[in-house]
Curated annotation (Swiss-Prot):
Recorded GO MF terms: NADH dehydrogenase activity; oxidoreductase activity, acting on NAD(P)H, quinone or similar compound as acceptor; quinone binding
Quaternary assembly: NDH-1 is composed of 14 different subunits. Subunits NuoA, H, J, K, L, M, N constitute the membrane sector of the complex.
Subcellular location: Cell inner membrane
The protein's Enzyme Commission number: 7.1.1.-
Gene behind the chain: nuoH
Keyword Nucleotidyltransferase: no
Protein name (Swiss-Prot/TrEMBL): NADH-quinone oxidoreductase subunit H
GO cellular component, one term: plasma membrane
Keyword terms of this UniProt record: Cell inner membrane, Cell membrane, Membrane, NAD, Quinone, Translocase, Transmembrane, Transmembrane helix, Ubiquinone
Example GO BP: aerobic respiration
One Pfam family named in its UniProt record: NADHdh
Positions of transmembrane segments: 22-42, 59-79, 93-113, 124-144, 171-191, 198-218, 240-260, 285-305, 321-341
Task of the protein: NDH-1 shuttles electrons from NADH, via FMN and iron-sulfur (Fe-S) centers, to quinones in the respiratory chain. The immediate electron acceptor for the enzyme in this species is believed to be ubiquinone. Couples the redox reaction to proton translocation (for every two electrons transferred, four hydrogen ions are translocated across the cytoplasmic membrane), and thus conserves the redox energy in a proton gradient. This subunit may bind ubiquinone.
Amino acid sequence: MTICTDIIANGYDLKTLIYNSGVVSIKVIALIICLLLATAYLTFAERKVIAYMQLRVGPSLAGPFGLLQPIADAVKLVFKEPIIPAKADRKLFIIAPIITFVLSLLGWSVIPIDHDIVLSRIHIGGILFILAVTSLGVYGIIIAGWASNSKYAFLGAVRSAAQMISYELAMALSIVAVLIVTGEMDLIQIVEAQKTRPIWLTIMMLPLAVIYFISILAKTNRLPFDLPEAESELVAGYNVEYSSMAFAMFFLGEYANMILGSSLMTIMFLGGYLPPFNLEILTFIPGYIWFILKVSMVLFCFLWIRATLPRYRYDQLMYLGLKVFLPIVLAWIIVVSAILVYSNNLP
């Protein structure tokens, strides 16, 4: 008798299955809603922060202090007419933004916001799952560039693919160093391992944290590495032909990946949901509050850099990723491993 027959034959098991499915569905819907709201208001925060840095007011007309601006933008994009170029590959043109958007949400299923707040805890492959999902996102961009039948979109897609692959190496290797230090692949255990990690070891991981952060900037196509969307060269890059909700999906996917990358940096290098320096006096504040504050701090650095730095040339971008960051990360992994063995601090 098959498993399905066993479930149907046993009424209790069927009820349990339905109940568990309902609970998981509610959690997934709640996570998606929270992520969409966070993404929408990250765009608002970006416009406000950059406006203040440039001595402007920023969005201020839609609602008090402009707080309804993201809703106004969403309504505008929903009701805009979706335009598909006559010579575009219609099916691929529509599928591309969906791929990018869905993959940007999948990584959140294993992110622990607190010790007990995680949608799906994968004990062995949480890190591998996030790396795999974020790496697949480039396929949506490549498909968009190809399907648009535009030289600007195609060049933007090629740039994006090369850029993501180049910086994926440095980012993944910086995470490997964390796995060597903690001896864990479970994201929650990685955070818990930072409770007892010596302070000198935390300081030694800071250069890798900086390289990881810069790699995330390149991976999410943010300034100073927004070469795939360089306005002065490619108009808008791979999404130049997109409008309406298709454009919104690319937009939301980019910002969702920013938040995901910041969350992973918080877990790997900043103690996740633990208080700063694991101070006992601060443990009365819930872990998810610390997690949100740390992620917000990393995201502010994204916005600060966008308002401050000019765009790199493409050759400088590739040189930095392959000839500077990659050797540094490899050398640093060797140094950290040797120190762990010498000091008898292997996990």
